[in-house]
């Protein structure tokens, strides 16, 4: 769901310094997904190329429940998001936001924009670092935070707690039922206008030419600790050494 495509992609520039594997890993490291929303969601997990699919790539998570599972015990990178408004239509599974090709188990497929995205690079560097961040580059569909537990270092909680559906500018609103239903997502400017400037493509594909817009500033003002455009500050990815758990909380 990167920009104008229907895939969620971790910005490659954030991975260049994260490629060395750690020498030892925490054998009890787990990932936990928590649904604090007053409705059911369908979390999805997509690995980057060459890494294994976790939990078959997606599942149902009812309101006020959680699901924990072992983190990979070797270097892994990928992304997690929530699908919302899912049901069966004419015998086919479909989600209003974050849909991954009409299936409950995404099995490595990316999701459709807009969707709030948690990004991870696990087990890298000399101190078994896990790096994590939250991106609104491809829009917003649900509040989401990442909380590390029992790691070494600063290990901050990051993410977007605000419900941007209530304040999303009209031009960015994404509505269900073919655009005639309620607002279920807030699109990025790239998704809304498809321009090279907003999508940071071609001439604009560099830190010097890809700049924040009034639309990305809307996201940044509401959720300052998130990525809001393609060349936003790499410092928004945070490192935590040997955490016991990384917890993704929807509707914190």
Curated annotation (Swiss-Prot):
It is found in: Secreted, Cell wall. CDD domains: TLP-PA. GO terms for cellular component: extracellular region. Its main location: secreted. Keywords: Cell wall, Secreted, Signal. GO terms for biological process: defense response. It comes from the Eukaryota. Coiled coil: none annotated. SMART domains: THN. Residues 1-24 form the signal peptide. Transmembrane segments: none annotated. PANTHER family: OS03G0233200 PROTEIN (PTHR31048). This is Osmotin-like protein.
């Amino acid at each position: 769901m990167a920009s104008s495509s229907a895939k969620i992609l971790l910005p490659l520039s954030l991975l260049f310094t994260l490629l060395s594997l750690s020498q030892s890993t925490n054998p009890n490291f787990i990932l936990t997904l928590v649904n604090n929303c007053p409705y059911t969601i369908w979390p999805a997990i997509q690995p980057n190329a060459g890494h294994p699919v976790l939990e078959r790539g997606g599942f149902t998570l009812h309101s006020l429940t959680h699901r924990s599972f072992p983190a990979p015990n070797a270097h892994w990178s990928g992304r997690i998001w929530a699908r919302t408004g899912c049901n069966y239509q004419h015998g086919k599974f479909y989600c209003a936001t974050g849909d991954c090709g009409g299936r409950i188990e995404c099995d490595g497929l990316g999701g459709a924009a807009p969707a709030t995205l948690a990004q991870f690079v696990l087990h890298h560097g000399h101190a078994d670092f896990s790096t994590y961040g939250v991106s609104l580059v491809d829009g917003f569909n649900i509040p989401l935070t990442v909380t590390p537990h029992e790691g070494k270092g600063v290990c901050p909680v990051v993410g977007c707690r605000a419900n941007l559906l209530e304040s999303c500018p009209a031009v960015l609103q994404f509505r269900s039922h073919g655009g005639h239903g309620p607002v279920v997502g807030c699109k990025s400017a790239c998704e809304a206008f498809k321009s090279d400037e907003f999508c940071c493509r071609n001439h604009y594909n560099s830190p010097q030419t890809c700049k924040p817009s009034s639309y990305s500033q809307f996201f940044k003002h509401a959720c300052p600790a998130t990525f809001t455009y393609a060349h936003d500050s790499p410092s928004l990815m945070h490192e935590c050494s040997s955490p016991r758990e990384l917890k993704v909380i929807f509707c914190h």
